[in-house]
A protein has these predicted regions:
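Extracellular-facing segments of soluble proteins and assemblies that are Gly/Ser/Thr-biased and enriched
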Residues: 113-180
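Short, recurring structural edge motifs at helix starts
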Residues: 89, 149-156, 205-211
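Short linear interaction motifs
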Residues: 81-85, 145-151, 202-203
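Surface-exposed coil/turn segments at beta-strand junctions on protein surfaces, enriched
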Residues: 96, 147-149, 159, 214, ...
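Domain-length functional cores that host ligand/cofactor binding and catalytic or interaction surfaces
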Residues: 162-284
Length: 318
């Protein structure tokens, strides 16, 4: 389970922006205003890998960062295969405007690289080219999320804010983007490639961060089938504030924290359009459903147990 109530600052002072705009206006309005302003302030940019997802992801370029905008919902299937579930579900997220993901345009090798084994147990450490954040392979308890059965068949699950994210490399994206471009970018700015080099050769001599220099002395990370799966920390310079990379996009829980549901296995997940979903899970062989619709303003949920009993809840997102 993750607590994602985090603050993101690009080249705006977000706290000052919130004060000027009026906190009572709510996150949705603030993001709408910010997105409008930032769209005019910064041009659309090209960054290898992202173009394959141009219908759902936009990349802008500021003075210091590539700014990645998405709604946090991937086009691929989700949730199926999870065996350790906190009863969180994927919902749309406000990753736009001043809340977009920030990738440094010019990454710099750090004099003191930091390992993800004892840093960055909160928040994202990378962003995939489909606009989905990637968290530390270790969850916030320090356990390997994959080995704990917390991840779906695509390497992701949902956090405290019902936000979908990966904890291992989304190597399945290579079937979309190919092997010659990154599948993700670490938040220090260095690219993350798949399990082979761009020329198809075997990856060798990775450092403890899952990266190495190429023949042109350019640094990059690689995905691996074993820990750390993705960048195992940062070879590049980053700022760490309260256990996470800064800047960091903001998500906010809209309902009470889910509890572990012992014996639950997620067996199905379907969607109708962009905002209506049906999650199927079994407990002791009995089928249950969570049917819901989610926008940035409201989430409406129906919990249907194996006997057909239904409980409905509606949450406002502020």
């Amino acid at each position: 389970m993750h607590d994602h109530e985090i603050i993101h600052v690009n080249e705006y002072d977000r706290r000052k922006f919130l004060k000027i705009s009026g906190i009572a206006a709510g996150l949705g309005l603030v993001n709408s205003i910010a997105s409008h302003e930032i769209s005019f302030a910064y041009p659309v940019a090209k960054l290898p890998g992202f173009s394959a997802f141009s219908k759902s992801v936009r990349v802008l370029k500021s003075e210091k960062y590539y700014l990645v905008e998405s709604d946090g919902i991937p086009s691929h299937q989700m949730m199926v295969g999870i065996r350790s579930w906190q009863q969180q579900v994927p919902t749309t997220q406000p990753y736009s405007g001043t809340n977009a993901w920030s990738i440094p345009i010019t990454p710099v090798i750090s004099k003191n690289p930091m390992s993800a084994k004892d840093h960055f147990l909160r928040g994202a450490i990378a962003i995939a080219v489909n606009g989905i954040p990637i968290f530390n392979a270790l969850n916030n308890r320090g356990d390997d999320a994959l080995l704990a059965g917390e991840l779906d068949n695509w390497g992701g699950h949902c956090g405290r804010a019902d936000d979908y994210h990966y904890h291992i490399a989304p190597t399945h994206l290579q079937s979309v983007v190919g092997s010659k471009v990154p599948i993700a970018y670490a938040l220090d700015g260095f690219p993350i490639y798949g399990e082979k080099e761009v020329d198809g050769k075997k990856v060798v001599n990775l450092d403890s961060f899952n990266g190495h220099f190429d023949s042109k002395k350019n640094y990059h990370y690689h995905a691996t089938k074993t820990y750390p799966y993705i960048n195992g920390g940062f070879k590049g310079t980053v700022a760490e504030i309260e256990g996470q990379v800064d800047p960091q996009s903001l998500t906010k829980a809209f309902r009470p924290a889910g509890e572990p549901l012992r014996g639950a296995v997620i067996t199905g997940f379907s969607r109708s359009g962009q905002s209506t979903f049906d999650l199927t899970y079994s407990v002791n062989g009995l089928e249950n459903h969570v049917k819901y619709s989610a926008t940035l303003k409201e989430v409406s949920m129906q919990f249907i147990d194996s006997t057909g009993n239904t409980r409905s809840e509606v949450y406002s997102r502020k």
